[in-house]
Amino acid sequence: MPWDARRPGGGADGGPEASGAARSRAQKQCRKSSFAFYQAVRDLLPVWLLEDMRASEAFHWDERGRAAAYSPSEALLYALVHDHQAYAHYLLATFPRRALAPPSAGFRCCAAPGPHVALAVRYNRVGILRRILRTLRDFPAEERARVLDRRGCSRVEGGGTSLHVACELARPECLFLLLGHGASPGLRDGGGLTPLELLLRQLGRDAGATPSAAGAPASAPGEPRQRRLLLLDLLALYTPVGAAGSARQELLGDRPRWQRLLGEDKFQWLAGLAPPSLFARAMQVLVTAISPGRFPEALDELPLPPFLQPLDLTGKG
């Protein structure tokens, strides 16, 4: 239970000066215990010890001026940052809704839903993200969609969804997991861009940054560009026929360059000039037929194309 420095025993009976001194001592103790909890999670200490600390020893100073124990939601944020998979799995299994609830005001900048999915993508915590998504399977559809399609703070995160974060940071494993669990690829960020449009802009910048000076290593931008092309292929699997037309202006603005970068078939489809190839359409039908409850396990039953096979969706790699 939270304790309050303003209550009897905290120095309030001694007047304003004593009350202020008690408050200062309480805040100092909170800082010490918060740092101890941070270190314990960072050092991957055993789950039982972390839970004992969270329940009885570690406190933070909340927005109401009280020393409060860390909630499962706040503890999960620490586990995500430090990749403590065992602790994250425990919190999600024991407190599924509380672990994914919004943290207190001191841990967020706005009233958006819990930031755990976006944080897992940002830190590339594939294993914990997979466990979060597995936990969401048992949530009602509306609640699940609210968590998956959470829009980040417009000031700090640009109003984007977790899919935008995955595209911005080139996280193909995270993107595939999110799409397979029903994240919406058509939502726009604060700048009005869908994940596909954001990705095309980044590909355009990558192509424009190719070294041209003599002696510069031509392969320097190759790996990031290949990851973004893989992201594009994954988004294409979940983009309904006709929905890619929003990228038309971007593509037709520099047609020769995009044809060279994407290949003719993909360019024609994304620019809205032709339907997807039979192969692309067949893969769309196969992959989108997998229900979130069987994703990604059911992928093992499919004859996947080579570009999907290197993806490690377990988080163990």
UniProtKB/Swiss-Prot annotation:
Any one annotated GO CC term: cytosol
Effect of C109S: Inhibits the vesicle-to-rods transition under nutrient-limiting conditions. Inhibits the vesicle-to-rods transition under nutrient-limiting conditions. Prevents the colocalization of ANKRD9 with IMPDH2 filaments
Pathway listed: Protein modification; protein ubiquitination
Magnesium is among the record's keywords: no
Region (Disordered): 1-25
Subcellular location: Cytoplasmic vesicle; Cytoplasm, Cytosol
Domain of life: Eukaryota
Keywords tagged on the record: ANK repeat, Cytoplasm, Cytoplasmic vesicle, Repeat, Ubl conjugation pathway
GO biological process: intracellular copper ion homeostasis; proteasome-mediated ubiquitin-dependent protein catabolic process; protein ubiquitination
Motif extent (Important role in both nutrient sensing and binding/regulation of IMPDH2): 109-110
Subunit structure: Part of an E3 ubiquitin-protein ligase complex with Elongin BC (ELOB and ELOC), CUL5 and ANKRD9. Interacts with IMPDH2; leading to ubiquitination of IMPDH2 and its subsequent proteasomal degradation.
Protein name: Ankyrin repeat domain-containing protein 9
Gene behind the chain: ANKRD9
